[in-house]
């Protein structure tokens, strides 16, 4: 294994001879600058080296004896082909060179950008002319994506573009053993690229192509589905491994293939694989070896080895030593099968608990890591310990070379490994079985001529000696070479195959006049040794011998080498010829050749070793069903992968096992099941879903199947369930006052006590994973957020506590913010700033290039408790701070924007926005509009590349209403969308976006505005838009009710007889949503048919399956609802009265069946399921008499869900799915054209019986773009819609000068003012372009260009992104995930005041946040700046988790006292933005925000 990182990318030298000179030849070549990239072309004496400072390249044709500069070439680096010893690349900034003759000749080619630093070249293992070249990635809008080029002629012609937006690419045949000898997939390339319609890392896809990405295929994994969130891939011997990461989880799913056609999900039993916490090691030809970190803060791991197809991994070595770079002290002895050297941490318990320094021990295995033994020194009792990969001091392998059985290392004897400089050089010539001291002090070392000569140079300082041995390095056989100067050796190297007698030392020596000079010393032993004869060889040297002196069996065979005898002073002289072993098979031995099978754990040692079923053991299919008392299963053993022993033993055979020793499977049922659990208490305070990593294929029998919920009652008892509420247990045995799920890491949850003690789990509470840490101070008692989390560094936590607050009323009590970079563990807290209201991490994945350490805080001026707030910033944990704003009311960060609300001297509120956390600009709004309406405004949504802003027109109590205005695509100009929209006293608005579909929204308007202005009661009607607010229409009432009776009004007249539904302002539980992001086109609502909306008590329940075009009444009365299995099942339960049953539908609401879950009626407050709506389990939450209860409803047993649905993206209607396209109800021509394109979504066929299972990507494709029509346009800035639907100038306004766009030097022409502008979401092309109906004119200076070319001009989105002021009014994209203050002070529905442990905690994440500006005396008028529906789905547990739709910058006292705390979840939903250009200012498919 070549350990190159951080070292000099070396390689090495050649040539040999035989003669008998007294001393070796020594030649010294000086260089002017420091050298890097010293490397050999394999099997030759040709070497290259590079000067670091100037990039000059030098070539030697005689193994480093002489060097010549390669003319006209200056590079950044040299990369040699690992598969062809004549090919290398020199990479420059934009000009590059390639050689096919070991550097004698170089041909140049160019790229537009410099090469990627992440791995610039992809080599084809079988065709040296096929090369991939990766350009540097664009990280400006993170995550980093770049362009890849390809050549099939070795860059004789210019390289061609492969893909523009890849994370990484490689050839399928990127390693020699992959598809070796198989004549297929020669041109196949695999790339991890951006998602179909998103460049967020959670949407990254793995694509394959056989024709250079003219056509692509997305491979299906073992689940039969494609997998998004691809993070990495690597070629390992005969395997390709790809890693996928689910959103809000650092846990990875590894997929393995041996042909790229079929992929398997790699299973690690009880252990999880996490991002940046695993290393794929130098694997064998028949298995993959992976070292997995066991702790985030302690660099230790466990070594796992796979079975032969790379699917099942078993643990071989525990507590392996690692370093921060991911390197592991693990090396296979070269050329000898089965011998492995590792270093393990002996005091692992102390290291994990208290952070003690690691005490390392070295161990060796002769059976590929299945068993280990100590390293012993001849004639000594003590153990030997050697420095390994984590402490590299030379290039190439650490211990060995292809020289058979010759191993060297620097270390010491004793209990543990000491410092490198306290070590000595040891040697073994029996592959590490026994060792002896070679030289005192630490030395660099190298092997030559198949071990005939060993060379060493002092490595603790300058030296004028070089040591060598012709007798296997045994003590007292080392000779000296005396130099005329002292050298500090930096690298000692020879040919990679160690067959040469020539060596090179690169180092530095003192220069006359001061300073140091860099030199390469060439050593040649060729003339010192005669050629060996037959008598000088041991023809059957073996790795180790048994007690009888016969070669012992390793991996099922005896491995025999022809090796020079240790005391024969002669040269093997087989230059460039690697030693080849002979193999003799052995009979299988049940102890030696077997290991524990998957899901079996080893106990005992040696012949007492047993393999017991592990906790995650599962019965074979069909076992122990009915009355069966036993079953046949694995013996617990398997033959070690790659073991070539002959015959069988008893361990190959299945054994009879008793069913009583195994957990019986739950009896299968074809019915719905329910389980009721009762709890003491009066109220459920909190419930959260800890949803599993959804990248798992769902077939795991250990991790991944759980559906974990944590819950807290008002008795301060926290409970946890891993099976969606069938079995509950106490989470911790202590009083808990709050639960904090980690906002960005689904596996992490925190249980807060009233003291400094915090319990936590980083594994969803599984496997006894709940631990505790001590917070620096008690939680604050000011209703401020206590914990904040970092979106990327999952263990970085901000803690907002109270100092001097132990006694009530202490005047010195104040808040202090602390930060931990170790998840609160190991006393890792550092103080940030005191007297703060809120702190938040600023870094986000997309669009903000700031340091990960950057933090914003609101701090009281001069650290005075009652002083106004300042917004301060720091990127060094407040060693220095920068004051951004004075008089701050609130701030929030979103994926692209940071929004700050400040109070001006006249008590008005101002908003400022920033893209980069450095430059802020004030949000500007239409002047005349705000001359009329100066009360309050609410940012409703910005998920469709435009901000929806509600401006209050009438602020009088119980008379509130206002207008919704909508921005253009950069958020800087607003037009009227809908007037007289209902608002409540708290500032929340009846407006809701439909989940999973673009541009569909529902709002309630006031139809008796004049009367309301005089104090009358509001009369409300519902409106719906299908083109993002450009047109609004009444909801079409169904023809008949659920009793098949007609309504008593004329439904043809929608304004007098429409469907009206209750909105956000009236919900008892505001987390309920009309829709689900995974049940595309489906909505449920409660309301009535008639001229206006009546009371809640008079309402019935309605449903639509076509995104609100048509509706039907499904039940009389008001019901709560939840979607399961992505809409396969819909469950509804009576709201507001006692009940003992639910109704459910498995055909999208066509038919409803009753299921009775209890033998008496109970009051149900809420129904919830997992945030992604992918489960077939639900929970009912409620109260029965004086007890709380939770009811699990499990629909998975129904016959309808016994098979998994089949989805083929290449032929989507062939299986169990249809393609469905939403339509516009008012569009006669091409009604399926919405926003200028036909979008196609997967929807399960109504009559098929199958379960969706793993979450599918709802959006299939954009089938085509459409011609532009009137529906693709809305009124332009300064225009508004009149009663006829036409766009007219706002009264009192004059038209702006259209020629102002010419101030942009890139604009060559402009259009006269028009009344229309294109809807930001629309992608229409051609047709009638209403925004260009004005005359076109040239800009000054471009008249000639104008005559030649009448191309369209105008504002480009790119400018909107790079000019900070353009973000000014991009106030939105508020999702609960999009707030920094996720847990508080951005008040999401709690009363003002109370303690941090109040039952209406501030981190109860309603997706609305009201900014109280204290604008008027005696009344706080809200600036509700926040919302969005993309979250709402993230919804705290099912659709009920998401809330009606706003996030707000939280001030005083807007909110409601909700008694129900049902269905908090931690996911968040997704709003599907289909415009492939994700660069707009208002957020991409989903933002990472916290509230």
From Swiss-Prot:
Region (Disordered): 640-667, 1018-1047, 1464-1491
Sequence ranges of the BNR repeats: 97-107, 364-374, 426-436, 719-730, 1102-1112, 1143-1153
Cytoplasmic side: 1376-1405
Composition bias, Basic and acidic residues: 647-667, 1038-1047
Keywords: Glycoprotein, Golgi apparatus, Membrane, Protein transport, Receptor, Repeat, Signal, Transmembrane, Transmembrane helix, Transport
Gene3D superfamilies: 2.10.70.80, 3.30.60.270, YVTN repeat-like/Quinoprotein amine dehydrogenase (2.130.10.10)
Membrane-topology annotation of the record: Multi-pass membrane protein
InterPro entries on file: Sortilin_C (IPR031777), Sortilin_N (IPR031778), VPS10 (IPR006581), VPS10-sortilin (IPR050310), WD40/YVTN_repeat-like_dom_sf (IPR015943)
Lumenal side: 22-1354, 1427-1491
First-listed, main subcellular location of the protein, grouped into a coarse class: Golgi
Signal peptide coordinates: 1-21
TM spans (from-to): 1355-1375, 1406-1426
Function comment: Functions as a sorting receptor in the Golgi compartment required for the intracellular sorting and delivery of soluble vacuolar proteins, like carboxypeptidase Y (CPY) and proteinase A. Executes multiple rounds of sorting by cycling between the late Golgi and a prevacuolar endosome-like compartment.
Stated family: Belongs to the VPS10-related sortilin family.
Name the UniProt record assigns to this protein: Vacuolar protein sorting/targeting protein 10
């Amino acid at each position: 294994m070549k350990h190159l990182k951080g070292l000099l990318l070396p390689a090495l030298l050649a040539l040999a001879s035989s003669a008998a000179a007294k001393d070796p030849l020594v030649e010294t070549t000086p260089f002017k600058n420091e050298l890097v990239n010293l490397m050999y072309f394999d099997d030759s004496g040709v070497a290259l080296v590079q000067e670091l400072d100037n990039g000059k390249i030098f070539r030697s044709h005689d193994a480093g004896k002489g060097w010549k500069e390669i003319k006209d070439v200056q590079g950044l680096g040299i990369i040699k082909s690992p598969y062809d010893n004549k090919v290398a690349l020199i990479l420059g900034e934009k000009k590059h060179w390639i050689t096919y003759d070991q550097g004698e000749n170089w041909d140049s080619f160019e790229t537009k950008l410099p090469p990627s630093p992440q791995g610039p070249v992809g080599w084809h293992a079988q065709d040296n002319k096929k090369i991939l070249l990766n350009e540097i990635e664009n990280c400006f809008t993170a995550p980093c994506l770049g362009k890849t080029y390809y050549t099939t002629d070795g860059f004789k012609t210019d390289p061609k573009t492969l893909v523009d937006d890849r994370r990484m690419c490689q050839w399928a045949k990127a390693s020699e053993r992959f598809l070796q000898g198989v004549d297929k997939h020669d041109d196949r390339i695999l790339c991890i690229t951006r998602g179909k319609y998103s460049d967020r890392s959670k949407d990254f896809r793995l694509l394959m192509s056989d024709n250079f990405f003219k056509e692509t295929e997305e491979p299906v994994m073992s689940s039969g589905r494609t997998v998004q969130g691809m993070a990495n891939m690597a070629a390992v011997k005969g395997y390709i491994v790809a890693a996928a990461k689910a959103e809000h989880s650092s846990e990875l799913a590894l997929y393995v293939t041996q042909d790229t056609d079929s992929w398997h999900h790699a299973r690690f039993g009880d252990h999880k694989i996490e991002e940046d916490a695993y290393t794929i090691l130098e694997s064998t030809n028949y298995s993959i070896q992976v070292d997995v970190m066991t702790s985030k803060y302690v660099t230790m791991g466990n070594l796992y080895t796979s079975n032969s197809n790379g699917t099942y991994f078993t643990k071989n070595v525990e507590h392996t030593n690692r370093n921060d770079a991911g390197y592991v002290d693990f090396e296979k002895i070269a050329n000898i099968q089965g011998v492995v050297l590792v270093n393990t941490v002996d005091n692992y318990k102390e290291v994990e608990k208290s952070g003690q320094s690691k005490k390392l021990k070295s161990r060796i295995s002769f059976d590929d890591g299945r068993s280990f033994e100590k390293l012993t020194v001849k004639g000594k009792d003590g153990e030997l310990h050697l420095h390994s990969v984590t402490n590299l001091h030379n290039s190439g392998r650490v211990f060995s070379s292809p020289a058979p059985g010759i191993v060297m290392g620097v270390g010491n004897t004793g209990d543990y490994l000491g410092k490198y400089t306290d070590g000595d050089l040891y040697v073994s010539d029996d592959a590490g079985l026994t060792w002896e001291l070679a030289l005192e002090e630490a030395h660099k070392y190298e092997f030559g001529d198949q071990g005939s000569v060993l060379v060493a140079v002092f490595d603790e300082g300058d030296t004028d000696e070089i040591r060598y041995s012709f007798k296997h390095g045994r003590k007292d056989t080392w000779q000296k070479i005396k130099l005329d100067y002292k050298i500090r050796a930096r690298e000692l190297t020879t040919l990679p195959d160690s067959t040469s007698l020539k060596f090179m030392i690169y180092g530095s020596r003192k220069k006359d006049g001061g300073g140091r000079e860099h030199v390469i010393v060439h050593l040649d032993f060729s003339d010192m040794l005669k050629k060996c004869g037959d008598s000088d060889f041991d023809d059957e040297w073996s790795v180790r011998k048994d007690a009888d002196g016969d070669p012992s069996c390793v991996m099922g065979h005896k491995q025999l080498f022809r090796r020079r005898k240790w005391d024969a002073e002669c040269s093997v002289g087989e230059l460039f010829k690697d030693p080849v072993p002979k193999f003799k098979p052995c009979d299988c031995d049940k102890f030696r050749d077997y290991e524990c099978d998957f899901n079996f754990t080893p106990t005992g040692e040696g012949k007492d070793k047993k393999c017991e079923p592990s906790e995650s053991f599962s019965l074979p299919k069909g076992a122990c069903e009915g009355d069966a008392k036993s079953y046949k299963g694995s013996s617990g053993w398997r033959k070690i992968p790659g073991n070539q022993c002959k015959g069988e033993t008893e361990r190959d055979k299945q054994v009879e096992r008793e069913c009583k020793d195994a957990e019986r499977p739950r009896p299968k049922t074809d019915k719905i099941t329910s389980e009721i659990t009762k709890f003491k208490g009066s109220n459920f305070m909190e419930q959260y879903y800890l949803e599993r990593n959804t990248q798992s294929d769902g077939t795991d029998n250990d991790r991944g199947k759980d559906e974990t919920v944590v819950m807290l009652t008002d008795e301060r008892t926290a409970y946890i369930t891993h099976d969606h509420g069938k079995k509950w247990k106490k989470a911790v045995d202590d009083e808990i006052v709050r639960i904090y799920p980690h906002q960005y890491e689904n596996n992490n949850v925190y249980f807060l006590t009233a003291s400094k003690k915090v319990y936590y789990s980083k594994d969803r509470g599984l496997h006894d994973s709940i631990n505790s840490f001590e917070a620096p101070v008690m939680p604050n008692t000011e209703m401020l957020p206590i914990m904040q989390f970092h979106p990327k560094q999952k263990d970085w936590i901000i803690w907002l506590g109270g100092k001097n607050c132990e006694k009530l009323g202490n005047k010195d009590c104040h808040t202090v913010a602390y930060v931990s970079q170790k998840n609160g563990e190991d006393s890792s807290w550092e103080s940030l700033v005191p007297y703060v209201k809120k702190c938040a991490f600023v870094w986000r994945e997309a669009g903000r290039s700031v340091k990960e350490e950057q933090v914003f805080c609101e701090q009281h001026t001069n650290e005075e408790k009652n002083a106004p707030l300042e917004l301060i910033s720091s990127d060094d944990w407040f060693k220095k701070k920068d004051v951004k704003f004075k008089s701050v009311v609130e701030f929030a960060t979103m994926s692209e924007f940071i929004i700050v609300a400040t109070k001006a001297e006249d008590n008005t509120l101002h908003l400022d926005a920033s893209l980069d956390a450095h430059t802020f600009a004030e949000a500007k709004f239409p002047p005349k509009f705000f001359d009329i309406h100066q009360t309050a405004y609410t940012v409703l949504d910005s998920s469709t590349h435009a901000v929806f802003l509600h401006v209050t027109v009438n602020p009088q109590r119980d008379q509130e209403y206002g207008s919704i205005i909508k921005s253009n695509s950069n958020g800087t100009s607003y037009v009227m969308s809908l007037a007289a929209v209902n608002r409540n006293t708290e500032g929340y608005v009846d407006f809701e976006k439909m989940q999973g579909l673009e541009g569909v929204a529902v709002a309630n308007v006031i139809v008796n505005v004049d009367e309301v202005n005089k104090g009358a009661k509001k009369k409300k009607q519902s409106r719906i838009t299908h083109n993002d607010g450009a047109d609004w229409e009444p909801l079409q009432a169904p023809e008949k009710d659920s009793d098949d009776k007609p309504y008593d009004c004329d439904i043809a007249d929608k304004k007098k007889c429409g469907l009206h539904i209750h909105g956000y302002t009236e919900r008892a539980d505001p987390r309920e949503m009309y829709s689900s992001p995974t049940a595309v086109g489906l909505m449920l609502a409660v309301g009535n048919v008639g001229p206006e909306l009546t009371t809640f008590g008079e309402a019935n329940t309605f449903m639509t399956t076509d995104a609100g075009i048509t509706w039907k009444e499904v039940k009389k009365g008001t019901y709560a609802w939840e979607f399961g299995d992505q809409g396969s099942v819909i469950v509804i339960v009576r709201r507001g009265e006692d009940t003992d049953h639910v109704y459910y539908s498995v055909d999208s609401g066509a038919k409803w069946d009753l299921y009775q879950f209890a033998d008496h009626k109970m009051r149900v407050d809420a129904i919830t399921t997992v945030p992604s709506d992918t489960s077939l389990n639900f929970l009912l939450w409620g109260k029965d008499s004086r007890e709380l209860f939770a009811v699990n409803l499990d629909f998975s047993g129904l016959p309808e869900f016994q098979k998994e649905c089949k989805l083929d993206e290449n032929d989507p209607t062939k299986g169990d799915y249809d393609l469905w396209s939403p339509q516009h109800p008012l569009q006669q021509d091409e009604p399926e054209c919405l926003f200028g394109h036909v979008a196609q979504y997967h929807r399960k066929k109504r009559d098929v019986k199958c379960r969706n299972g793993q979450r599918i990507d709802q959006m299939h494709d954009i089938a085509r773009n459409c011609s532009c029509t009137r529906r693709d346009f809305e009124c332009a800035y300064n225009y508004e819609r009149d009663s006829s639907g036409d766009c007219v100038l706002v009264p009192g306004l004059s038209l702006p000068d259209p020629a102002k766009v010419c101030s942009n030097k890139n604009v060559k022409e402009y259009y006269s003012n028009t009344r229309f502008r294109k809807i930001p979401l629309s992608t229409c092309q051609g047709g009638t372009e209403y925004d260009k109906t004005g005359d076109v004119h040239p800009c000054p200076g471009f008249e000639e260009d104008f005559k030649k070319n009448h191309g369209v001009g105008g504002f480009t989105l790119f400018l909107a992104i790079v000019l900070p002021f353009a973000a000014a009014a991009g106030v939105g994209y508020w999702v609960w995930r999009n707030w920094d203050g996720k847990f508080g002070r951005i008040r999401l529905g709690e009363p003002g005041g109370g303690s941090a442990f109040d039952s209406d905690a501030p981190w109860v994440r309603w997706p609305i946040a009201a900014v109280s500006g204290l604008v008027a005396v005696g009344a706080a008028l809200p600036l509700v700046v926040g919302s969005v529906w993309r979250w709402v789905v993230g919804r705290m547990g099912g659709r009920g988790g998401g809330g009606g739709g706003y996030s707000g910058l939280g001030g005083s006292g807007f909110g409601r006292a909700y008694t129900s705390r049902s269905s908090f979840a931690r996911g968040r939903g997704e709003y599907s933005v289909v415009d492939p250009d994700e660069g707009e200012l208002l957020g991409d498919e989903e933002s990472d925000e916290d509230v």
